């Protein structure tokens, strides 16, 4: 263990000092070591620093706990990444409230060329799980050099990790507790596999419980580490939306998949898109093009893209088949005749298909297939 690791870990144990204040101190003074070594001169080095903060730095208990944690880390192949460490995530370091210490167990480079965060509801539907799987599979075909970040939670998070491993993407799980446990325990097997192609990351020392407030802190790391955050499926309220909001505040790109307007677990995504807080994507090619990333091959059209929307009704499939044969598009009255669907039903079906990103309403009341 190094002096900087000890001092930085100790800083996180000082009561009453938040991440923004800690980041600001390190940026102005240079390092955690310098903060303690020049404690008596801090008021001159950092204008506005309070006497209360300076006094709080005299905390032997913090050093004792820091040394215990670093011994635990060394015994368990855990890296302690301080704020100025070359292996600390560069994208995260740019955030005002970045953690000054991260504990990491894994084998992948956290400063990969391309990093995305995939998040969503814990109560994922078959639609959301299929979306997540299809997106990552398509990404593997056109842009395989990506690090995938998520939170190891139930639902979309664990689906993202497992599918990433399936298609040989490195994937990192950001935890809301220490590295002495895996929560939820049902994901232990996946977490172990991730340490061979990715890893587990946290700002919390061992012994920290996965308390509610820690998940919000965890979400800022998920948002801060990435180039872009992708919300696959979310209710009107939830952690995925918090992550999306944080990503926006960090000036990250944010994307969301649309869903049916009446579906509870698509309400959050639809709201993000409606309020221009996330860009609508239908597939991996949409995403890669929006990011301006080079990609190897064109994603297959037609059936492959349509797999992102597996829950099509018989009427929706019929409309798609008709529009495939009429590439210039068709007016609603012509679709009613061709599909033998009453106009009272046709309007609602076309709206659902447009929300899914399958068709688009053009000038003159013409509907055209986008796939």
What are these regions (language model features)?
Residues 1-142:
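Short, positively charged patches
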Residues 2, 82-371:
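Glycine-biased, small-residue-rich flexible motifs in mid-sequence functional cores and linkers
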